[in-house]
A protein has these predicted regions:
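Long, well-ordered, tryptophan-enriched scaffold segments
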Residues: 263-367
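A glycine-rich phosphate-binding loop feature that marks nucleotide/adenosyl-phosphate handling sites
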Residues: 160-161, 307-310, 364, 407-418, ...
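N-terminal export/assembly segments and adjacent metallocofactor-ligating motifs
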Residues: 2-299, 325, 466, 471, ...
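Phosphate/diphosphate-binding loops
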Residues: 497-498, 545-564
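Extended redox/cofactor-interaction regions of prokaryotic respiratory oxidoreductases
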Residues: 2-3, 173-260, 267, 285, ...
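Active-site phosphate/pyrophosphate-binding segments
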Residues: 323-324, 328-442
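Long, contiguous, secondary-structure-rich segments that constitute the structural scaffold
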Residues: 556-608, 700-702, 706-717, 721-808
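Catalytic or ion-translocation cores adjacent to nucleophile or general acid/base/metal-coordination motifs
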Residues: 520-545, 755-756
Length: 808
């Protein structure tokens, strides 16, 4: 017996033998193990088990700490952050059940283990195993050919948010290692916008010059909270998110909370004082009706509007604006449409009773400070840019901007410890498209123009997309719109000639790869991840490899370094700078320390696992400096003020090519949309359909975990009134369909959704026979969503859809 086999006077062999006997005795109920044997068993367990810090770095906006227990190179169980005193402002970053189920992702039987190449048609999911050399040689050869034949503008890095928090592992196209590689090789076609925030990110800068909002924790200073489509209890429900902070802040302020949403969300769920169900896409009409009351009952903050704003009334209307082109004229019916935006007018559009609109207006007009915010659901409509700017009008009209306890009308901001990321270098290609328009760029790229399709950097595209990198993302198919149309475009190999997918699983997007590479998960490699939306407490998490590399899975940095070698020694040197992944992390963290000496050292952070820091200013107040001194601290708008009327938008509206039913306005007006509540198409497809963030998934991540799928099954929500008309009972299998496709799944008959509306959790994995009937049995909402972009941002209006639902 070796020395290593001896522990506290008992051998491993004796312990195992004794434990087996003891277990039999326990089963028989005869006696319990002696204390010494139990202590020895625990000692053996402890000696063989280690705890490794990791993180859930998916795109929910939280990024939570994980403590993974590892035994014999396998994760046995997972716990979360247990450090600190766990007090408000210095709380534990506790992962939700998604993050805590990560062991099931790591050990999932469907993990990709080897490089593969496609042998069937794109989308069939037929592949054969190949060597890494063959895979890398094929990629490099195809990339060289594409650049030589079409130029670098024909190479595109697909939108991805599967790994948003990582430094070395980050998948966001503008900040990923793939972007760095391409910038070392002549660049690639750029993209702007995002599937999360395209419309609001585009629109709000025309009003404020940025997208800032007060931090959630500032609600402790509020008297009223009004949330338009903001649902953190499902989108950011963990300890790294803002739900905990929202509850704690309201405990301090006792602020009344009103939730305005087509669906009674988990954020409401007893936390709210009132839920106002509203027709999807009509938030701007509600705002206009509220504004009419505020103006007519003298509840607007006129001194604020005069001093800080442009375009509220004739006093501050820009010289280039038409007569009566100001916001007040629009509301009172003195503008071009000659329609007063009365509560009666708004009620017909929104479905909210007249008396409730009047009451809400008076509540907003008399409660100060009021925290008025919006989630990203309302802006993900065909009129989302107008909606985002309209909601911002409520804090503007009442002077709640730039003060503690107030807000700008935007989504909440957060305090973050600034991290040094892997530099992506400059892109020699200056052309960009909306991230939602990539299928158009494959199908008819050279026909896309600046004034019709939003091409930036030149008047039109010169070439279509011919080569796609898809790293850690499912937007190639599952998260993009109109899956059946997207399938047609991708399956045509004469259009896009090479698709490289780097993934963990055979996702809906991976089935369309020409070369499919097995990636490591973030918890399987070293990285540093910062917080995202976490109120007023920032943190850093140091990830260490939870297990050794298994099968032939490789980290993204190794994969791209090997491709760089094959593109030439100069590309390889420029990409790596002679550093390994660990050396890059040390180099980047040293730069962080130089800028922020209060941080722990690299080795200290590695040992700590997580480092937390509270916002030294207490709470972030958006535009406070501007409010305090507008001349010394002007906004980043042309006038330096809040632009209710935007001359820049007026110019765009005059010069862009728009469809007859598209509206770009210098004012935050309400406009009907295609497939909206008042569309003629409702005669055929009478129900509005929108998606929502489902708590069992983060978009499509965790969508293949059986335990989570069982806990939260994929369903279509339908109101009892609409269900009764169709003979549908709760749990019935139904077909949800329109002219784009058909989905089959169970019905959830519930009063938690307004009549005339329906909803499905987005991110369910598409599951259809694409060579046959194309009926989706996985319940993916994007089988039904539109590919038509919004007018200004050219963003994804994936909540603007009409469907019919029938019992099967």
């Amino acid at each position: 017996m070796s020395k290593n086999e001896r522990m506290v006077g008992i051998s491993r062999r004796t312990l195992v033998k004794s434990t087996a006997i003891g277990s039999l005795a326990l089963a028989a109920g005869g006696f319990s193990l002696p204390f010494t044997l139990r202590s020895a068993a625990a000692a053996v367990q402890q000696a063989r088990e280690k705890v490794v810090w990791g993180a859930c770095s998916v795109n929910c906006g939280s990024r939570c700490a994980l403590r993974l227990h590892v035994k014999d190179n396998e994760v046995t169980w997972v716990e979360t952050d247990n450090t600190g005193s766990d007090e408000y402002g210095n709380h534990q970053v506790r992962a939700c059940l998604r993050g805590r189920s990560i062991r099931r992702r790591i050990n999932h039987p469907d993990r990709l283990n080897y490089p593969m190449k496609r042998v069937g048609k794109r989308g069939e999911g037929k592949f054969e195993r190949i060597s890494w050399d063959e895979a890398l040689d094929t990629i490099a050869s195809s990339l060289k050919k594409t650049v030589e034949q079409y130029g670098n503008e024909a190479v595109y890095i697909q939108y991805s948010s599967g790994i948003v928090g990582g430094n070395m592992t980050r998948s966001s196209p503008s900040a990923s290692a793939v972007k760095r590689l391409m910038n070392c090789y002549g660049g690639s076609l750029n993209q702007y916008g995002s599937y999360s925030t395209a419309q609001i990110s585009c629109a709000m800068p025309y009003t404020y010059g940025s997208n800032d909002g007060n931090s959630t924790t500032d609600i402790e200073n509020s008297k009223l909270v009004v949330m338009f489509g903001n649902n953190p209890a499902e989108t950011r429900m963990s300890g790294g998110g803002i739900t905990y902070l929202l509850e704690k802040a309201r405990e301090k302020s006792n602020a009344k909370m009103i939730v305005i949403d087509p669906r009674y969300t988990d954020t409401a769920a007893g936390r709210e004082d009132e839920w106002l169900p509203i027709r999807p896409g009509t938030d701007a009409a509600l705002v206009a009706g509220i504004a009419w009351v505020l103006i007519n009952e003298n509840l607007v903050d006129q001194p604020f509007l005069d001093k800080y704003c442009v375009g509220y009334d004739e006093k501050t209307l820009p010289a280039d604006a038409p007569k009566n082109g100001h916001y007040k004229a629009y509301i009172l019916g003195e503008g071009d449409d000659n329609t007063a935006k009365t509560p009666q007018w708004a009620s017909q559009i929104t479905g909210i009773p007249v008396d409730r609109i009047i009451k809400l207006a008076r509540e907003i007009g008399t409660a100060k400070p009021a925290y008025i915010c919006q989630g990203w659901g309302p802006q993900r409509q065909a009129n989302g840019e107008l909606t985002a700017r309209a909601i911002a009008m409520l804090p503007i009209l009442t002077g709640n901007v730039g003060i503690s306890g107030g807000n700008s009308g935007a989504r909440e901001s957060t305090y973050t410890i600034t991290i040094e990321r892997l530099p992506v270098l400059d892109n020699p290609v200056k052309t960009s498209i909306s991230c939602f328009s990539w299928t158009d760029a494959i199908d008819h790229g050279p026909q896309m123009t600046a004034i019709r399709d939003g091409v930036r950097g030149k008047d039109k595209l010169d070439v279509p997309i011919k080569f796609i990198w898809n790293y850690a993302g499912n937007t190639l198919v599952n998260q993009h719109s109109d899956i059946n149309k997207t399938h047609e475009i991708l399956q045509d190999e004469s259009k896009c000639e090479m698709i490289v997918v780097i993934e963990n699983f055979m996702t809906s997007s991976a089935k369309y790869a020409d070369i499919l590479l097995p990636d490591l998960m973030t918890v399987e490699q070293e990285d540093i991840i910062p917080n995202d939306y976490a109120g007023n407490m920032g943190y850093l998490i140091f990830l260490q490899p939870v297990t050794s590399e298994k099968f032939e899975r490789k980290p993204i940095y190794w994969i791209l370094s090997e491709v760089a070698k094959r593109l030439g020694p100069d590309v390889y040197q420029k990409f790596t700078e002679g550093r390994t992944q660990e050396q890059w992390l040390q180099h980047l963290y040293a730069k962080m320390l130089a800028k922020d000496p209060a941080l722990p050292s690299y080795d200290e952070l590695k040992k700590m696992g997580i480092y937390k820091r509270k916002d030294p200013n207490g709470h972030f107040v958006a535009y406070k400096a501007f409010r305090d001194d507008p001349e010394a601290n002007p906004l980043k708008t042309p006038s330096g003020k809040i632009e209710i009327y935007s001359s820049k938008l007026a110019e765009i509206a005059r010069t862009w090519e728009l469809e007859k039913d598209e509206v770009i306005s210098p004012l935050p007006v309400y406009a009907s949309t295609f497939e909206g509540w008042d569309s003629p198409e409702r005669r055929t497809f009478p129900l509005q359909l929108f998606g929502f963030h489902y708590k069992s998934r983060t978009h499509s991540t965790y969508g293949n975990i059986d335990l989570l799928k069982a806990a939260c099954r994929q369903e279509v929500w339908i109101n009892p009134i609409d269900a009764q008309k169709r003979g549908i009972a709760n749990g019935d299998m139904v077909r949800v369909f329109n002219h784009r496709g058909e989905v089959r799944l169970p019905a959830k008959v519930t009063p938690r959704i307004l009549p005339g509306g329906s909803a499905m959790g987005q991110g369910a994995w598409h599951e259809a026979n694409m060579s046959g009937d194309k009926i989706d049995h996985g319940g993916c909402v994007n089988t039904l969503t539109t590919l038509r972009p919004s007018p200004l941002a050219k963003g994804n209006p994936q909540h603007t859809n009409l469907v019919e639902i029938e019992k099967i």
